[in-house]
Amino acid sequence: MFPQIFGKYVLERELASGGMARVYLATLRGAVGFEKRLVVKQIRPELSVDEAFVKRFVEEAKIAVELSHPNIVPVYELGVELGIYYIAMELCEGLTLTEILTDTGPLDPAEGAQVGIEICRALDYAHRRRNIVHRDVTPRNVLLDEEGAVRLIDFGIAAPVTSALSTERVEVFGSPGHMPPEQIRGERLTPATDVFAVGALLIEAWTGRPPFRRNSFEASADALNEPLPSLAEEDEELEPIAGIIAQAVALKAAERPQEAEALARKLREFSRQFDSGDVAKRRPHLRVRGFEP
């Protein structure tokens, strides 16, 4: 089945598959032996004939192509080949936060703080410079590359920050258990929407357990009203940051930090008590696994 020719790309193997898209390791081949490895994400053929879906995919891909930040995996191209729409993006060898938590368990306080700080850097750029919210900040969309950098991936469902005067309903996209109430209800999206997702992600990173994710959309929404896990009971070193994280996942958007940078400042203050060093350097074995078979 592989390799497959797909326009100017050679698809080497499938990396992931979901309800909307398939993701492939690919090679771009040019003159005199030039080769570049990257990732190609194709929307499923049955969705390529859905005009509304294609329009949204193209609009979102145009947003992603414009993003340029050290903590965001860049998208190189939006295209269509044989009637199939796709985006090509940088190949970052490393592990997702989901893989790290599965393989080695929860992060320690310093590691989690560093991950949170770098995610917030990416989001602050998206919010301030591009006026968009990510809408899907989850452990599977956070990548730790082999150089130790934290990279935010998949701005595929990013959306413009919603005006405070807007009464238009926003389409509900995102991952159950990582969306705040206003996102679930299709209401106004602001930077505080992503701040909630970062707070939920950090709780999971430090405890190994997602605070709100359950087996269904409805159960995940109901879990928002359940008591939060106690970070201080998980690790007493987390006590100084526990209150800030509780604010980040407040059900009312107005009660959260209103900017990603505001949360990052608190995380930087918290992290000053620890030795410096990124997660990959603190856990060298994480650097040996990437997209290679």
Range-by-range predicted roles:
Residues 115-116:
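Activation segment signature within eukaryotic-like protein kinase domains
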Residues 22:
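Conserved N-lobe ATP-binding subsite of Hanks-type protein kinase domains
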Residues 42-66:
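AlphaC helix of the eukaryotic protein kinase fold
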Residues 177-278:
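C-terminal lobe helix-coil module of Hanks-type protein kinase domains
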Residues 78:
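Activation-segment/catalytic-loop signature of the eukaryotic protein kinase fold
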Residues 82-96, 100:
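Conserved short submotifs of the Hanks-type protein kinase catalytic core
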Residues 121-132:
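Protein kinase catalytic-loop region centered on the HRD/HxD motif
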